[in-house]
Structure formats: structure tokens, C-alpha cells
Amino acid sequence: MKILYLAPIPYDGLRQRPQYIADGLAQKHEVIYVNPTVSWLKYFLKGGDCPWGYSGVRPSGVQVIQLNGAIALPRFAEGLWSGFGFPERLAIKKWLHSVDIVWIGFEPWYDLLKHFNGKMVYDLMDDNTKLSTNPLMRRLIVRT
């Protein structure tokens, strides 16, 4: 089985439940782990992960992908208009036809899959509306 895992946190970051789930699934299935997109603006203002895309396979067998965030805007801006996710929607569209299941671990990813008719697992890690201090991000989470 081929699984597209739209993750809430980067695979190579602090090890948490999403990475362990992906590693466990990779023991018997092909797993494509899509890291959250880093926009050029977020990278410029806060640093951290580079916004340019990359791909690689980890020792556990998980294929990790970082989508190119060069033309993406910060995630919180999607609370104003959902069209900001368009570059990501185009990027993941190529995988949607070849996977058996899409595993979603972050509410805004779901917004990118409105027209996907295949099997989905929606894994809500936390109630992010209570964790986020950004009003636009809370608005986006509530909307999705």
C-alpha cells in the first residue's frame, strides 16, 4: 500500500508521534512523508528550514519531501484567503493519483484535498485553536 502522509511537523525535527507513525507504517508500506511547507517569508523572518524543496529516503524507508515554498505565503495568511495553498495543491496533485491513502496530520492540509475522493485518515494531533496565538491561524483552523 502507498501512503501520502501530509505531516504536521518536519520529519527531521524533534521526534514526536507523526514520525513514529510514519516509521511504523513504512515497515510494511511505502510512505511519502510531506513536511510542512516553509514559505520564503517565514524563512526570511524566522530562519529555520530552507524554503527550497528537497527529497530523500530515511533509513526507516520513509521518503521525506519538502515542497518548494519559494512562491508560498506563510500558513497563517490562508486564514484570509484559501487560494494561498494553490502551489501546494499543484505539488501534491501528482501523488494523489498513485497513492492508496492520504494521511492528514494538520488541519490546513485538509483544505488542499477538498476534491480528493480516495481514502483519507485525519489524525488530529492537538486542538490547535487553543494552542495558536495567531488570530489568522486560528481562523484558518476553524474554517477547515
Please provide the spans of the model-predicted regions:
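Short, basic, glycine/proline-bearing loop/turn elements
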Residues: 2-8, 75-78, 122-131
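N-terminal subdomain of nucleotide-sugar transferases
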Residues: 1-50
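An aromatic- and histidine-rich active-site surface loop
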Residues: 84-89, 101-116
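A conserved catalytic-core segment of Leloir-type glycosyltransferases
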Residues: 39-97
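Flexible, charged surface loops at secondary-structure boundaries
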Residues: 26-27, 58, 94-100, 114-115
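Short, charged/polar "capping" segments at the starts of alpha-helices
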Residues: 39-44, 109-112, 132
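Active-site proximal beta-strand in glycosyltransferases
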Residues: 103, 113-130
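Membrane-proximal helix-turn-helix segments that form the acceptor-binding/catalytic region
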Residues: 87-94, 115, 127-144
